[in-house]
């Protein structure tokens, strides 16, 4: 499998639809949760789809798609943190400081491709994209599955995956829910899709 990572532009909307399926990925969210909070499940799923499509049409691209050939097999939402207002309404995820960070806030991987390195490839590509955009750091909000009573809802990723990619915990307001960051001002040392690190390793972003 050779993954190619591409930004979600309007011409790739049908690829996202195919990946998410009729249910809109996670409970019909259509990646609206961090934008509008729990209101996403109080309205028809089609309304979330329409709202997120408007985000895509308006631009800039709100995330990255991983392709295996012509098939989209993975997705991550990647934006400046301020584009996701509901993060600051989440008690455990409020801002650590005023740094102009970007947020890697959720993932979705197609069945049959899970546990095959798709998430790691998306993380590696996201680091490159955020750095080129001028972000000081890339932030994420994973679940620490090594902690008791951690949730099984892992759409934000797992802490161990991000740790392998070089992210460090900068806040932990509950044992199972750290805020992790990768400093993008340091010399570039981007992990590949397997988590291996080195200054020359890249995941193609087209």
Label the predicted regions:
Residues 30-63:
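Active-site rim helix/loop that mediates acceptor-substrate recognition in acyltransferases
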Residues 153-165, 170-206:
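C-terminal "cap" of GNAT-fold acetyltransferases
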Residues 106-109, 115-132:
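Conserved acetyl-CoA-binding loop-helix of GNAT-fold acetyltransferases
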Residues 58, 67, 71-110, 114, ...:
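Conserved acyl-donor/pantetheine-binding loop and adjacent beta-alpha core of acyl/acetyltransferases
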Residues 65-67, 77, 179-183:
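Short, well-ordered beta-strand micro-motif
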Residues 123, 130-152:
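Conserved GNAT acetyl-CoA-binding A-motif
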Residues 1-35, 192-193, 197, 206:
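Conserved N-terminal entry element of GNAT/NAT acetyltransferase domains
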């Amino acid at each position: 499998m050779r993954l190619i990572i591409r930004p979600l532009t309007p011409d790739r909307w049908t690829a996202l639809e195919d990946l998410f399926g009729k249910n809109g990925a996670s409970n019909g969210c259509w990646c609206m949760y961090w934008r509008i909070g729990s209101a996403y499940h109080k309205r028809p799923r089609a309304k979330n789809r329409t709202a997120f499509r408007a985000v895509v049409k308006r631009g800039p691209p709100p995330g990255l798609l991983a392709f295996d050939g012509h098939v989209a097999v993975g997705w991550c939402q990647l934006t400046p943190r301020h584009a996701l207002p509901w993060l600051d309404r989440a008690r455990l995820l409020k801002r650590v400081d005023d740094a102009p960070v970007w947020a890697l806030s959720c993932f979705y991987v197609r069945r049959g491709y899970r546990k095959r390195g798709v998430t790691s490839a998306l993380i590696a590509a996201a680091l490159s994209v955020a750095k080129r955009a001028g972000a000081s750091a890339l932030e994420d909000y994973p679940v620490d599955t090594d902690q008791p009573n951690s949730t099984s809802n892992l759409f934000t990723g797992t802490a161990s995956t991000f740790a392998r990619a070089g992210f460090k915990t900068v806040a932990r307001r509950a044992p199972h829910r750290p805020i992790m960051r990768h400093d993008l001002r340091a010399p570039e040392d981007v992990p590949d899709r397997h988590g291996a690190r080195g200054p020359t390793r890249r995941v193609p972003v087209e």
